[in-house]
Amino acid sequence: RVIWLLEELEIPYTLVHHQRDPLTRLAPESLRLVHPLAKAPIIVDNGITLCESGAIMEYILNQCVDDILRPQKSSAEYYQYLEWLHFAEGSLSLPVISTLLMSMEQRDGRQALDGYIAKEVQLDFSYIENTLSKRQYFAGDSFSAADIMMTIVLEIAEGLGLLENRDSTKAYLVSMKQRPAYQKAASFG
């Protein structure tokens, strides 16, 4: 997400890779030396070190002179933008990542968590589909950082088969993947 945002804004950056443990997928000690939580992504800029995609994106956008990739604060679209920017991590990521993790283990579908996750997936993706059936982007008529935040989670959901019968969401995802800055960011892996 952060690389995609930097590419959209044409801001130069230096990318530093920290290899995770191949078995545990845990971050290496080198990442903990950058930030005590050792979670990626992390940005280090002018003496400021932040983790969390949403916080990093807001920091980067606040460094821009113009309101690029977010609606004017006085507009109704700004509040839609905020909702979707935070929905990606606040509400949507839990059921999507839980589905991903549960797909990696043997389950019989009767655990309480399975029912909760299934309900949340249905609710969240119905909301997304309804929104995207009415407009091209999450925060109105213009591409914004909220679209970047949402796209990455939707990609994971697509890989898990959670976008079946969600034609507007699938079409949206195709259009996001066609953006040159997305493609450049995706080339980094």
Feature names for model-found ranges:
Residues 1-115, 129:
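GST-like domain detector, emphasizing the conserved glutathione-binding G-site
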Residues 19, 145, 189:
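Short, solvent-exposed turn/loop segments enriched in Gly/Ser/Thr/Pro and often Arg
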Residues 36, 65, 165, 178-181:
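Amphipathic alpha-helical protein-protein interaction surfaces
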Residues 44, 181-182:
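Short A/G/S/P-biased low-complexity tracts
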Residues 55, 168, 181:
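Residue-level recognition of oxygen-bearing side chains
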Residues 85-178:
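GST-like fold's C-terminal all-alpha helical module
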